[in-house]
């Protein structure tokens, strides 16, 4: 992205704010090397200036990357109001028919230091609340699946009937994928607040229960009272628009995603 911006003579500053119109940061996970980005986020958003967020993609992890305005997932504006069916095939995904492959309900955690989690309780409380809500409607077995880099220790799984914790295992044939696909081979539904596991489940034909912040909201369910009869809507139009949330490295270099984002910034976010 920086290479492209320089090639088009955009005025850019690295790690300094010279009264800039927009900030660009990597991720809204306020941890480690990304912790300083929180100050940038708060400074720009607090003064009404937009923040473009880059992060790892969910369609082709570490090959494609998301780029959105003022957030991630469904909270972001991806400048994808216009889209077609030409981009989705680039990600080489084939939808599996909607088909519950088993009887297990999988609850996927997220990282508690992410901006996406700011309005939620602790992960232990989240898992507990989900279990108790699901148990109002079914005694199907439940698997708790923590985020691979945010393991929840000492969760009292034995306190509940037919509940177990399944820790993600690294797939060493990939950069940092896990064995989530294996879990999907025996799954009734996936419960996930707003992160990528829901997307993987939908593509593989497993119904999902998500929040309004999830990119799978339009093809998912939001009320666990429907756990025994989840909706399984058409997915192609959703996928066509989703494909315009992620871009490949060469496209960043060519400026394709920036052209969309820049136009949207000027249209809606940058004060003139």
Where are these regions (language model features)?
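Active-site regions of enzymes building and remodeling cell-envelope glycoconjugates
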Residues: 20-25, 48-51, 66-71, 155-177, ...
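Catalytic core of nucleotide-activated saccharide and alditol-phosphate transferases
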Residues: 17-18, 22-118, 240
């Amino acid at each position: 992205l920086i290479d492209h911006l320089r090639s088009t003579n955009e005025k850019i500053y690295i790690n300094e704010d010279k009264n800039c119109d927009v900030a660009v940061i990597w991720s809204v996970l306020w941890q480690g090397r990304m912790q300083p980005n929180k100050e940038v986020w708060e400074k720009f958003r607090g003064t009404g200036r937009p923040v473009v967020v880059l992060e790892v993609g969910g369609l082709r992890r570490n090959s494609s990357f998301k780029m959105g305005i003022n957030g991630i997932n469904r909270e972001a504006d991806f400048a994808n109001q216009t889209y077609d069916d030409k981009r989705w095939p680039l990600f080489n995904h084939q939808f599996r028919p909607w088909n519950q492959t088993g009887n297990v309900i999988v609850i996927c955690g997220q990282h508690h230091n992410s901006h996406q989690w700011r309005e939620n309780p602790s992960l232990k409380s989240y898992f507990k609340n989900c279990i108790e809500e699901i148990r109002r409607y079914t005694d199907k077995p439940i698997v708790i699946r923590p985020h691979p880099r945010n393991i929840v220790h000492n969760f009292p799984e034995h306190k509940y009937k037919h509940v177990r914790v399944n820790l993600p295992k690294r797939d060493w044939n990939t950069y940092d994928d896990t064995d989530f696909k294996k879990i999907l081979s025996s799954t009734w539904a996936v419960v996930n607040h707003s992160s990528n596991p829901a997307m993987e489940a939908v593509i593989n034909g497993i119904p999902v229960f998500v929040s309004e912040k999830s990119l799978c909201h339009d093809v998912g369910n939001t009320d666990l009272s429907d756990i025994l009869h989840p909706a399984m809507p058409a997915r192609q139009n959703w996928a066509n628009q989703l494909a315009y949330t992620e871009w490949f490295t060469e496209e960043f270099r060519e400026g394709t995603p920036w052209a969309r984002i820049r136009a949207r910034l000027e249209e809606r976010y940058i004060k003139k």
